[in-house]
Amino acid sequence: MKLNTNSNAYIIIYSAILVVIVAFLLAFVFQALKPMQDANVALDTKKQILYSLNIRGLDGAEAEAKYKEVVKTKAEDDGHILYGCVVNGEHITVATLKGMGLWGGISGYLAIKEDGTVYGAYFNHESETAGLGAEIKDSQAWQEKFIGKKIFDENDNVILSVVKKVEDPESQVDCVTGATLTSNGVDAMIKESLKGVRIYQVDCRFPTKSAEEE
């Protein structure tokens, strides 16, 4: 009996078989590439932590080596993820930041000196406007404005702020020009993410697992 390739039944069965084959191939490719994707994500995270420590311009292998050299511990307490680091003999704590910008999620890392001032900062975003809100990631000069700023008051409350008009240069940073709402998101992210961090601040002596045990 000759198969009728123009029949509805044939078309439906043929299409279903193609869908199954394509789905299988996509699943196979995804699984095959997943280890590489996970490794890339892990490397990007390490680079961002290094950026907050003012260590930039390293390729993949260099970044991996430098991360192992300076990042000594990782601690998770009360929702905080902290990294204990030693840079040029100085104990630095890197705090993880997460929040919302104007159009999507924003994140970052803030490096904190033992005296409670900023050692360095790095911010990232998912979908902020290029040339405006995206400057929180793209402008190293803006990130460097945080260096030296006071983060906590005498009661360990977060006073580091991103504002439209700086009145207290000791603890305030100018917002990104033309990106007030994104800057407000960074300010809220800092306040929320660092709440209570002073209590849990760690360094290389913190009794926790190695930063490589992730």
Question: What do the PLM-derived regions correspond to, one by one?
Answer:
Residues 2-214:
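Flexible, solvent-exposed loop/hinge segments and secondary-structure transition points
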